[in-house]
Amino acid sequence: MSDSENEGPPQLSSYALAALQEFYAEQQHHHSDLCGDDKYNIGIIEENWQLSQFWYSPETATCLAEDAVAAAGEGGRIACVSAPSVYQKLRERHRDDVSVCIFEYDRRFAIYGEDFVYYDYKNPVDLPERIATHSFDIVVADPPYLSEECLRKMSETIKLLTRGKILLCTGAVMEDAAAKLLGVKMCKFIPEHTRTLGNEFRCFVNYNSGLDCNLSVQLPVQEGPK
């Protein structure tokens, strides 16, 4: 038997071992965040640009969430279709006030349990039986791609889910297509993202919305956790 066969398994240097321990600690901390109340923080699940994911700023997500709550009414049902930032704000601020579902292609959002509904816009009406048609007071939707095909297919889903009210967030270039497909009009409010986008982004609604009052929306004061 050679000397090399007697050496045993390779040993990590103290530097490599410390780096590995730090990595495991970070992973454990991240896992703890995903299991606790912090799982509703925007950015707790990182953007995947390959899926065209760009999160709203906390201020914008809050404005959209509050407008959706006002539109849905007390005890209302809200569907967030490809709009996870809005879902997270709804759950953070109105955990007991409204019922919310998050429709997402990205299965990482399955951490939200029964709220999560797997959704692929390419199969717009392929939804689980537990999701009844026209069962949501408002649908908040953000098509992942700026194309008429994507908007047209997602519009099928929106019309299948909503009882009437629609809050659509997409590029300004989709204004005519959005009006044609969903009967929505552009709001004055200008949404912002955590990263600067190359295209002008706007909100569109088909109801009397606070988002249409001003370019910046006054955020309501929250009286303690809910």
Curated annotation (Swiss-Prot):
Coiled-coil annotation reads none
Task: Write out the annotated subcellular location.
Answer: Cytoplasm
Question: What GO terms in the biological process aspect are recorded for it?
Answer: peptidyl-lysine methylation
Kindly state which keywords UniProt assigns to this record, in alphabetical order: Acetylation, Cytoplasm, Methyltransferase, Phosphoprotein, Transferase
Q: By its UniProt entry, which InterPro entries does this protein fall under?
A: DNA_methylase_N6_adenine_CS (IPR002052), Efm5/EEF1AKMT1 (IPR019369), Mlase_EEF1AKMT1/ZCCHC4 (IPR041370), SAM-dependent_MTases_sf (IPR029063)
Instruction: Enumerate the GO terms in the molecular function aspect.
Output: methyltransferase activity; nucleic acid binding; protein-lysine N-methyltransferase activity
Q: What is its EC number?
A: 2.1.1.-
Q: What catalytic activity is recorded?
A: L-lysyl-[protein] + 3 S-adenosyl-L-methionine = N(6),N(6),N(6)-trimethyl-L-lysyl-[protein] + 3 S-adenosyl-L-homocysteine + 3 H(+)
- Disulfide bonds, paired cysteine numbers: none
Q: Give an example GO cellular component term for this record.
A: cytoplasm
**Family per UniProt?**
Belongs to the class I-like SAM-binding methyltransferase superfamily. EFM5 family.
What's this protein's function? Protein-lysine methyltransferase that selectively catalyzes the trimethylation of EEF1A at 'Lys-79'.
What PANTHER family does this protein's entry cite?
EEF1A LYSINE METHYLTRANSFERASE 1
What's this protein's name? EEF1A lysine methyltransferase 1
Q: Lineage of the native species?
A: Eukaryota, Metazoa, Chordata, Craniata, Vertebrata
